[in-house]
Amino acid sequence: MEAQSSSRQVTGPLYLGVKEDWEEQHDVKAEAFLQAGEGRKEKGAQGQPGVGAVGKEGEGEELSGGEGQFGPGAPGPMGDEDKDGGTRAGGVEEEQNEPAAEGTESQKNGKPEDRQMPLQGSRFAQQRLSELQSILQRTNSFDVPREDLYRLMDTCVARVQNWFKIRRAAARRNRRRTTPVPEHFRGTFECPACRGVRWGERCPFATPRF
């Protein structure tokens, strides 16, 4: 028992010493790794010396309204391209406006002959009617051959026939309006004699007017 306790007392300090040595080595490695990382960061920052200046200048440009070396009035290829583009766009707009102005001038100075004339359908019908009336007045009869009317009026026979039909219907309508109506015909429509009575004749069954 005494031998075992003595061996434990001997191995205990040895184990503690080994553990302390391992912890010290681990701390040394960690410090070396951190120092190496910081050195890399410093080298990267030294390799880009204008980064901070550019960042400050960019912030100043944003605060001043965005006008800097790359603005619209800056000297260089960008400013020249803007000028060229502006002149080109202005030339295209002028070319587009010139044909429109020419078109308006031509419309203003256009001849009246070029404009579309209104239709003369009513005048044409009135002219044909006057010709037909003059023909009927000279002959004083409705028995004029339709072929002569067709030849004189320069129209087809069907139109002449249709015109005569319309004129007859109009004459009958006017005659009915001017002729008197039987007295009792206004009161009743059941008189058997009035059904066969002509316009203008008096019905034999008509009652005397008081």
From Swiss-Prot:
Region described as Disordered: spans on this chain: 29-117
GO biological process, one term: cell differentiation
Gene: Rhox5
Keywords: Differentiation, DNA-binding, Homeobox, Nucleus
Origin superkingdom: Eukaryota
Known role: Transcription factor required for differentiation of embryonic stem cells (ESCs) into primordial germ cells.
UniProt DNA-binding region: 117-175
Xref: Gene3D superfamilies: Homeodomain-like
Localization: Nucleus
Keyword Nucleus in record: yes
InterPro entries linked: HD (IPR001356)
Keyword NAD: no
An example Gene Ontology CC term for this record: nucleus
Species per Swiss-Prot/TrEMBL record: Mus minutoides
Molecular function via GO: DNA binding
Protein name: Homeobox protein Rhox5
